[in-house]
Regions:
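A short, polar/proline- and glycine-enriched secondary-structure boundary/capping micro-motif
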Residues: 61-65, 134-137
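Acetyl-CoA-dependent GNAT
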Residues: 54-58, 127-130
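Short beta-strand
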Residues: 31-34, 76, 104
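N-terminal beta-strand motif that seeds the catalytic metal site of vicinal oxygen chelate
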Residues: 1-18, 75-80, 126-139
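Core segments of cupin and vicinal oxygen chelate
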Residues: 2, 8-50, 54-56
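Vicinal oxygen chelate
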Residues: 3-12, 41-44, 64-139
Length: 139
């Protein structure tokens, strides 16, 4: 079976985004790459590789050819399973993240709390995880 091991998120400020995900979720910086079309900082929780991308959009590069490459921010959203929702929310907000809304019913285990990072990229946190994922717990 294929396994998801990589997600890429376009951000406005690489260092600020890397600091946010490192401070809140303890993701480790595992590399940086600077290319003609832009730069990336690679983070990991030990299983998933998260690429934080920033496209320069210089004339004649692939990013400028895509038009939205230099202005697009974020994937639609991604989710991170945590041990303590309230404690994680405090860390998110202290690091500059903003609460967005709650989705689902906590009594049935399909609950997630949505936030926006400092660049506006949307992400969820969940104590119980998501169906089909390692570590998912159904109430």
């Amino acid at each position: 079976m294929a396994r998801l091991r990589h997600i890429a998120v376009v951000v406005k400020d690489l260092d600020r985004a890397a600091e946010f995900y490192s401070k809140v979720f303890e993701f480790k910086r595992i590399g940086r790459e600077d290319l003609d079309i832009g730069s990336a900082i690679y983070m990991s929780d030990g299983v998933i590789n998260m690429a934080l991308l920033n496209f320069r959009g210089k004339e004649g590069t692939k990013a400028s050819d895509l038009k939205e490459g230099s202005t697009f921010v974020g994937a639609h959203h991604f989710g991170i399973q945590v041990d303590d929702l309230a404690e994680t929310q405090k860390k998110i907000e202290a690091a500059g993240g903003k609460f967005f809304f709650d989705l689902g019913d906590e009594r049935h285990g399909n609950f997630e709390r949505k936030f926006k990072d400092p660049d506006g990229a949307i992400f969820d946190i969940s104590k119980h995880g998501w169906q089909g994922t390692d570590g998912y717990t159904k109430k």
